């Protein structure tokens, strides 16, 4: 599988802590589409290649005022905290981690007992009849009967 990556110039680009903060703020505000746009931008992709034109313009319009305010705050923060820039990119910014309250929450999920089957209605109906008979009829009566039918045997479906 060969993929053409000539159009992607920044595929190994890492986002900085301020950009990560913006994405987390958008997620915490419930603006998941805007968070996707930000992630695509920060990763070096053009969001227009992945999001419909009208949706992208609506997101830009909704978030343009918020972006201007955030940009001013970002510039003020950048000017006042020059020493903070030397922080390693591998460390998570503490400002966004403190906003996620259930970060340490862990729930162990057991193995699911139900399986997903294909869309064979005849087989499903046969299984339902067997399960019903197993629950409500005597086991002796079930073993003596042959329970197979087709959709054409069901009169109520044709009506």
From Swiss-Prot:
Induction: By nitrogen deficiency; expressed in proheterocysts and heterocysts, transcription requires hetR and is suppressed by patA. Transcription is up-regulated by 6 hours after nitrogen stepdown, and remains high for at least 24 hours.
A GO BP entry: heterocyst development
Keywords of this entry: Heterocyst
Keyword Disulfide bond part of the UniProt annotation: no
Spans annotated as Required to complement a hetP deletion: 1-50
Effect of gene knockout: Normal vegetative growth, unable to differentiate heterocysts in 24 hours, by 72 hours less than 1% of cells are heterocysts. No heterocysts appear before 48 hours, by 120 hours only 3% heterocysts form. Double hetP-asl1930, hetp-alr2902 and hetP-alr3234 deletions have the same phenotype. A triple asl1930-alr2902-alr3234 deletion makes 50% more heterocysts than wild-type (although they are not active for N(2) fixation), while a quadruple hetP-asl1930-alr2902-alr3234 deletion has delayed development but makes wild-type levels of N(2)-fixing heterocysts by 72 hours.
Domain notes: The first 68 residues are fully capable of complementing a hetP deletion.
Quaternary structure and interacting proteins, as annotated: In bacterial two-hybrid assays interacts weakly with Asl1930, Alr2902 and Alr3234.
Family: Belongs to the HetP family.
Miscellaneous: In Nostoc filaments, approximately every 10th vegetative cell terminally differentiates into a heterocyst specialized for nitrogen fixation under nitrogen deficiency.
Role, per record: Promotes heterocyst differentiation and commitment when nitrogen is limiting. Interplay between the 4 HetP paralogs controls the timing of commitment to heterocyst formation and its duration. Epistatic analysis show that the 3 paralogs act upstream of hetP to delay commitment (asl1930, alr3234) or inhibit development (alr2902). Asl1930 and Alr3234 must also attenuate the activity of Alr2902. Required for heterocyst formation. Functions directly downstream of master regulator HetR to promote heterocyst differentiation, functioning downstream of patterning (cell choice).
Protein name, entry field: Heterocyst differentiation protein HetP
Gene from which this protein is expressed: hetP
């Amino acid at each position: 599988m060969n993929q053409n990556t000539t159009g992607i110039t920044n595929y190994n680009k890492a986002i900085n802590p301020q950009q990560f903060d913006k994405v987390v703020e958008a997620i915490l505000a419930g603006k998941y589409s805007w968070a996707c746009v930000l992630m695509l931008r920060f990763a070096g992709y053009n969001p227009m290649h992945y999001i419909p034109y009208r949706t992208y313009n609506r997101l830009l319009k909704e978030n343009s005022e918020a972006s201007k305010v955030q940009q001013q705050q970002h510039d003020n923060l950048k000017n006042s905290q020059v020493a903070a820039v030397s922080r390693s990119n591998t460390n998570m910014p503490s400002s966004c981690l403190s906003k996620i309250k259930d970060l340490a929450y862990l729930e162990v999920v057991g193995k699911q007992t139900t399986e997903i089957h294909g869309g064979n209605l005849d087989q499903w109906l046969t299984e339902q009849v067997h399960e019903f008979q197993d629950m409500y009829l005597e086991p002796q009566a079930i073993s003596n009967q042959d329970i197979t039918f087709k959709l054409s045997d069901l009169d109520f479906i044709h009506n």
